[in-house]
Amino acid sequence: MQNFKPYYAVIFTSTQNINTEGYSEMAIKMETLAKKQEGFIGIDSARETVGITVSYWDSLDAIKNWKQQSEHLQAQLQGRNHWYSWYNVKICKVEREYEFNASK
């Protein structure tokens, strides 16, 4: 953990409307686009009744730039108008991390 550098996590939690036509395609497009953004570190995502996507960034500026990226702005608008019945966004600073892996 000697070389650990704190980073930021954007936690996007949501519930969807009944009509999700086009959602999966847009989610794939946004993940592909996010991976090209300066400061992007990674992403984890899961969806059942409630969906949670956590994206990781090296700075608050990188998060701000992603939020204001033109195609992402269009996706946000479509999400509010068509796909989501509710969502919540949290931005957190990750000071420490660790993991367990039984296969190692």
Which residues are covered by each model-predicted region?
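Acidic/histidine-enriched, beta-strand-rich ligand/metal-binding domains
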Residues: R80-H82
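Sensory beta-strand/linker motifs that couple input domains to effectors
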Residues: Y56
